[in-house]
Amino acid sequence: MIFTILNVLTRAMLVMSMYSLTTWDSTSRNDMCFSNDSPLEGLVYYWETHSKRHDYKKQESQRCRVGDSDKKMITNVTIISLISEIQKSISELSLSCVNDDNSTGQVLTFNGLEDTIRGDYIVDCVTGLYQSDIGVGVGLGRTHHGHQQMKNKAVVIDEKERMISLLETQQSENDIKMQVLMSEIEQLKNQLSKKRNERGQEKRDAEKVMSDLMARNSDLRKHNDILTAEISQMKNKNTIQRNKNTVSTTVVPAILSVALLSSSVAPIIAAPPDSPMINPWPHAKNRVGTGMYKYDENDDSGCRPIRYGVSCIGFDFMLKMDKYPFFNAFIGHKTPLESFADKIIEKEEETCEIGTNKEFKCFEERAYIKGTCPTNINAVHYIDNKGKLRYVKCKENLEMTEDCAFCRKIKKKAGQSVQVQKTSVPLQDAICQENSDTYSGPKIPFKGVCKIGLIKYKECKFKTSSYETVSFITLKEKGKIYIEHLMLKNIEVVTNVSFVCYEHVGQDEQEVEHRALKRVSVNDCKIVDNSKQKICTGDHVFCEKYDCSTSYPDVTCIHAPGSGPLYINLMGSWIKPQCVGYERVLVDREVKQPLLAPEQNCDTCVSECLDEGVHIKSTGFEITSAVACSHGSCISAHQEPSTSVIVPYPGLLASVGGRIGIHLSHTSDSASVHMVVVCPPRDSCAAHNCLLCYHGILNYQCHSTLSAILTSFLLILFIYTVFSVTTNILYVLRLIPKQLKSPVGWLKLFINWLLTALRIKTRNVMRRINQRIGWVDHHDVERPRHREPMRRFKTTLLLTLIMMTGGNACSNTVVANSKQTRCVQEGSNTKCSITATITLRAGVIGAESCFIIKGPMENQQKTISIKTISSETVCREGSSFWTSLYIPSCLSSRRCHLVGDCVGNKCQSWRDDQLSREFSGVKDNHIMNENKCFEQCGAIGCGCFNINPSCLYVHAYLKSARNEAVRVFSCSDWVHRVSFEVKGPDGETELVTLGSPGTKFLNWGTLSLSLDAEGISGTNSISFLESSKGGFALYDEGYNEIPREGFLGEIRCSSESAAISAHKSCIRAPGLIKYKPMTDQIECTASLVDPFAIFLKGSLPQTRNGQTFTSTKDKKTVQAFTNGAIKALLSINLDDHEIVFINKVKNCDATFLNVSGCYSCDYGAHVCVKVKSSESADFFAESEDKTTVLSFPIQSGTHDYCQVLHFQKPLVDERLSYSCGSEPKLIVIKGTLVCMGVYDFRNKTGGSSTVVNPSEGAWSISNWFSGLLDWLGGPMKAILKILGFIAIGIVCFVLFMILIRIAVNSINIKKKN
């Protein structure tokens, strides 16, 4: 069964890669094809068999060649080696052996294709399908069909020897490859060794740095010990001095404040602030207040209270400086849970238990906050919108997941009694304080925000949501308030500062195993509460507030660094909040409507089609530039700002009519607008004629009788004026007499000469007549023999030549010849294979270039037409970047000296990328930011115990003012590209856009374009902008690679998303944000260039240096109008393309409709015909001299078809024979064309689109004159009519001169009177 399935699958295989063996003689031809895996024995066997069958192999040697090499005599013994070369080849290769006259021969070819079909088969040469097995056993030399072994043993021996030599050659090649691979392996080993050495050196350097740090740490510890000893000595001296002096002073504490506080915060100096480690302050677990980190009495005993050396998972997690940076910056303040235990804040009565309480209200606010939890805890807490503590816990023995959203049960480890600790962590990085202020001011706004969590600020139609780290405060009776710009200050006041006290374990003379400290409440000190027994001493702040000199102390008390009151700048006032911190919460931000909206249609604009162009009136905005495009041709107009503009007609639209797309740029604060105008077709004479211009005079067919008389009069007046000026100049130069000064004198002289010549001619004629009739005496005179001149008919030949009509259809047409086409009959159809490379000129815009493929029968043809759609000079973009409008925002925090990061001269060396711990909660926003530190005043007057300068830390960031961006780019070059509509031989249509050089692969062949064109210059001082919403603009500033302040591109991003989000990967000019520190707060400003204002002002189209810039047809880049021209050559390549001609007669009837346009011009004339056909076909018409050709595919039914033709004379009268596959019929194209003139004196300051292959044939006076004669009815009628108009013009001129003279005389008479 399996073998049967395999056999069926094998027969269904389609072989692509194959060998083909062709043998022929004078009587027959045989073709056989084999699969790719066919063995050498099989190929040799069938080569020998076919040779014998066709009686071809009779000589001992043959004339053979491999591939394109020269033919050589090759013996039959060595022919197998050549077949082996074909069998081994991986590319297309052939072996051919033929006789001298090619009457007999044999060819073995490999097509060079690839497939995955395995096996040796005989396949169909056309379809590639399996036919049969090859029938030759590999290496056996026999066939399965009973063929005998090859008789020529010498051939077998030679073949084996050749195979041995081939194997030896292959072995040598493998040895060479092996050597190369071994050398590469050695190089890789050397590189690996080098890398290992480098890593070893880096490791040694790191160990060296680590040893240096450890040594430095050791030095710091020694310095700390020395400093502690000095402080102790100074304490003793101070105690003695106090005993001596009963009057206490504040001078000594002030002097000692620096040293004493250095002792208390020295451990902080040893740990860098950015280190993601546990808070290094040794008294972090000596909490201010009761130190009860609990929600109820069931919480972990290690948290009730927090003590030295006792683990509390929840609080220990908060000491991680990367998780709660704000809390660790204010370690001397209380956590929210401690504040609840100390009655500072209240709790929500309802406790949420995950899995029990399914009401969403319990978790509604929690759902918007994102947090991180450690393992082995069962609860979280947070401050809700009411400013109260809300508690969320899991069921018994379930732990909170890492995202603090779910609960899970973990199996206990062996010997473990409790797996999950009953403690919690906060979802917010916050601290709380006592005695907060109340606030009764207005609602705190949050700019650009719709909603934060459950707090709604405004309704937004368009918004975006994301999790952000937002600062917040809580106030009494106000609840939680989110703050956009957090500005805080931390002051130190003796009357409002917290102390932590401790004693040493073992100082009561009981032995202890480990050295440790023990927490003591400050309220246990006798000097604080007289009912207590503990004798306490402390640092200078503690001793300044309490009397430390009563007796020998038991307990040491120090003030908690940064535990002084924390104030927030709220609406310009400093408020002491109840709690302050950060939370990562879901924020809905408003998405503003884009300022740069896509180009809008101007529906209210008014348009009118006038003789000189399209008149457009705006709805109030002032138009500066306009671009009109139709049928691929564009023209522009530029003017001073005005509410109306007249745009010239592009191309022949003034007479042809149709839709015109118009783009208008204006001075209003919006992008350019677009409108579509439809103009009706008009008579060519009315559209393109003028009276006082030379081409108006030349368009004789457009003149009426009155305009002809007026033209004649003006022509005579012009001649008279020129003649008068010339004769007067000659008279002044004494070159002519006075009698010839006036043109009338010259006219009299001409008439006298004419009459004299006529009289002499008459006299001579009369004399000859008298001599013939004998009225005069005869004299015998020998008559000379005159040779009769040959009649050349000069006049007739001239008139014949000038009356010939010139015309080109399809712009350029090439007909395939017999060498390019090979046809065979297949049933009722004809199958033709064409291989050709044709080069022809591209047509002007709207015209077509055609390649006509004719079949073997009359009127069989296929056409490849290439219609030129448009031509553009487009920008080749250079460097680019994205940018937007950015505004700065600042956060600030002032810390006293030796508090937090304000240590030593650290503020002076603060780096822009160094973030203070107060703002570490916002470090994950990934936006452009910088950090500053400004030294401010110190000492008690500025709320500090230390007289050294305090530190004002600033975290500034930039954010995009709008949710959009613009791309700025330069044009390194301007290149030409042309769009074509290509119709294949089977009627398939495809739109192709090509540059030079460019090639398009089509299903019938390839189309290539080569251009001869000049680029444009003068654009280096211009930059271009592209909106993310669509549209382009121009800016009169050169593109600079480096961002500079005060220029476009002060901030540059690599992508649109990076620009909108103000990502930190964007580069920016230095010093963009300006700072003004004011003791407790900062004012930051930035004056950045607004790219959106630039875009609106320079929205395309714009005109610079006589060139108009606008967007391309596909709206992907910028193009320029330059009034230029290009020469375009098309190359069509067909390689064995098959075309089927259906041997069926197709009838059609065609009627000429009209012809309109111009002659001897670039635009050509539109010839339109109406064709009726019962089915789809190819219409073909040509004149007898084949100079005028029409060719296009037609559809069934009756339709109108138009093509652009080029004529060289104004009167068109062409007789064409047309056919759609049947007998040819007659069609006559008849009409008149106008002369448009080479120059156009209308305003063209903006330029027009590039002309493709402008007309090389100049205006011809002979063609014009022949058309004039035909139009006037023939030579004789033309001469009489012209003389008549001249006579009428002279009469009008004489009357005009008489009237002038009468008017002058009457004026002179009035002056005399």
UniProtKB/Swiss-Prot annotation:
Residue numbers spanned by region Internal signal sequence for glycoprotein C: 793-809
Glycosylation sites (chain numbering): N76, N102, N496, N1154, N1243
Region (Internal signal sequence for glycoprotein N): 250-270
Signal peptide: 1-17
Highest taxon above the source species: Viruses
Chain residue ranges for the region called Important for correct targeting of the glycoproteins to the Golgi complex but not for heterodimerization: 769-773
Disulfide bonds: C303-C312, C352-C362, C373-C404, C394-C407, C432-C579, C450-C460, C501-C557, C525-C536, C543-C548, C602-C605, C609-C679, C629-C634, C810-C850, C823-C832, C875-C971, C890-C1084, C896-C944, C902-C951, C907-C933, C937-C942, C1053-C1066, C1148-C1220, C1158-C1161, C1168-C1202
Parts of the chain that traverse the membrane: 713-733, 1279-1299
Stretches the record annotates as Golgi retention signal: 731-773
Pfam family, one: Phlebo_G2_C
Span list, region Fusion loop: 896-902, 938-949
Side Cytoplasmic, residues: 734-791, 1300-1313
Keyword Secreted tagged: no
Coiled-coil residue windows: 178-237
Keywords, alphabetical: Coiled coil, Disulfide bond, Fusion of virus membrane with host endosomal membrane, Fusion of virus membrane with host membrane, Glycoprotein, Host endoplasmic reticulum, Host Golgi apparatus, Host membrane, Host-virus interaction, Membrane, Signal, Transmembrane, Transmembrane helix, Viral attachment to host cell, Viral attachment to host entry receptor, Viral penetration into host cytoplasm, Virion, Virus entry into host cell
Family, per entry: Belongs to the phlebovirus envelope glycoprotein family.
Protein name, entry field: Envelopment polyprotein
